[in-house]
Amino acid sequence: MTVAVIIVAAGRGTRAGEGLPKQWRDLAGRPVLAQTVAAFAGLGRILVVLHPDDMGLGMDLLGGSVVLVAGGSTRSESVKNALEALEGSDVTRVLIHDGARPLVPASVTAAVLAALETTPGAAPALAVTDALWRGEAGLVAGTQDREGLYRAQTPQGFRFPEILAAHRAHPGGAADDVEVARHAGLSVAIVPGHEDNLKITYAPDFARAEAILRERKGLTMDVRLGNGYDVHAFCEGDHVVLCGVKVPHVKALLGHSDADVGMHALTDAIYGALAEGDIGRHFPPSDPQWKGAASWIFLDHAAKLAKSRGFRIGNADVTLICERPKVGPHAVAMAAELARIMEIEPSRVSVKATTSERLGFTGREEGIASIATVTLIGA
């Protein structure tokens, strides 16, 4: 028996939020699609069906570990394209799986393959246990008997020659490959599905999926707290850069880079949470290449380092301490810029300001200080 796995990820759905197709969004430190591919590692050859515009992304993410196939205008066309790519091979069994189901247990896949020894098709499903209603105009119009009803899952498995012929003969518009198979007269066995095998569709599904992954690893949540502090003195100039935003002022800030005191404090907070020292360790002020450098370079490095270590940024809080300039009118733009660099939602970033009540060097308007706090959450 030679197995091929077809992972269908050609959709453009953004119901899960953030404007990015869900298969490319991060899940526990890796894109959803990478997690899905990993679930079938070692089983056989893997074909990943992508939207034509995403072929470059697929190559960057998966390289030569899989065969990339350009999808069609419908799911059925996408699957057929992958099946056609297998014609002439030695494949005898094919598993067709949703790219947005990254948590399929190996036991489910094994059950599907075992069933194919006695039937031309097999698919996992869970019996419907909730009460079912029929609705009309927002009102309950009746109830539906749930006896014999199932929630379909994937991978849906078939003997290769039969499902290829079925797709070639199907007129199109099928909800899934079981419908295509049944249209061709093929019997499809139901094998037990699994609650972990959820299809990521909406934003809350990501939190549920990450919880399942943590439970599988036997890990409690790894939460780290980092603090950062920075100070820069005023010098001659007509503006300051705070949290990536140019703010008009009667003075500038003195520093080896662009002296963005808020971004420096936040960057140090991330490094601190990772036990990675401070900016000076990674970007020494003695190195002339960083003279006048934009501070987003430092923050971007820290955020990517956190991600590479398996952490996501839970939230960031930056406090700027100065008498002038006024930060309030620019705070929203500052938070948005920090969020953009760290690739997190703006709602997870806070920028605010306070004074030292005319005390100390900030009270004497000799410079600006900043304190930042960040939480890192392990995947």
UniProtKB/Swiss-Prot annotation:
It catalyses: 2-C-methyl-D-erythritol 4-phosphate + CTP + H(+) = 4-CDP-2-C-methyl-D-erythritol + diphosphate; 4-CDP-2-C-methyl-D-erythritol 2-phosphate = 2-C-methyl-D-erythritol 2,4-cyclic diphosphate + CMP. GO terms for biological process: isopentenyl diphosphate biosynthetic process, methylerythritol 4-phosphate pathway; terpenoid biosynthetic process. InterPro entries: IspD, IspD/F, IspD/TarI, ISPD_synthase_CS, MECDP_synthase, MECDP_synthase_CS, MECDP_synthase_sf, Nucleotide-diphossugar_trans. Keywords: Isoprene biosynthesis, Lyase, Metal-binding, Multifunctional enzyme, Nucleotidyltransferase, Transferase. Residues 224-379 are annotated as: 2-C-methyl-D-erythritol 2,4-cyclodiphosphate synthase. SUPFAM superfamilies: IpsF-like, Nucleotide-diphospho-sugar transferases. 4-CDP-2-C-methyl-D-erythritol 2-phosphate binds at D230, V231, H232, H256, S257, D278, I279, G280, T354, T355, S356, E357, F361, R364. A divalent metal cation binds at D230, H232, H264. Pfam families: IspD, YgbB. Its cofactor is a divalent metal cation. Pathway: Isoprenoid biosynthesis; isopentenyl diphosphate biosynthesis via DXP pathway; isopentenyl diphosphate from 1-deoxy-D-xylulose 5-phosphate: step 2/6; Isoprenoid biosynthesis; isopentenyl diphosphate biosynthesis via DXP pathway; isopentenyl diphosphate from 1-deoxy-D-xylulose 5-phosphate: step 4/6. The record marks R15, K22, H256, T355 as: Transition state stabilizer. CDD domains: CDP-ME_synthetase (cd02516), MECDP_synthase (cd00554). One of its GO terms (molecular function) is metal ion binding. Its EC number is 2.7.7.60, 4.6.1.12. Bifunctional enzyme that catalyzes the formation of 4-diphosphocytidyl-2-C-methyl-D-erythritol from CTP and 2-C-methyl-D-erythritol 4-phosphate (MEP) (IspD), and catalyzes the conversion of 4-diphosphocytidyl-2-C-methyl-D-erythritol 2-phosphate (CDP-ME2P) to 2-C-methyl-D-erythritol 2,4-cyclodiphosphate (ME-CPP) with a corresponding release of cytidine 5-monophosphate (CMP) (IspF). In the N-terminal section; belongs to the IspD/TarI cytidylyltransferase family. IspD subfamily. In the C-terminal section; belongs to the IspF family. This is Bifunctional enzyme IspD/IspF. The lineage of its organism: Bacteria, Pseudomonadati, Pseudomonadota, Alphaproteobacteria, Rhodobacterales.
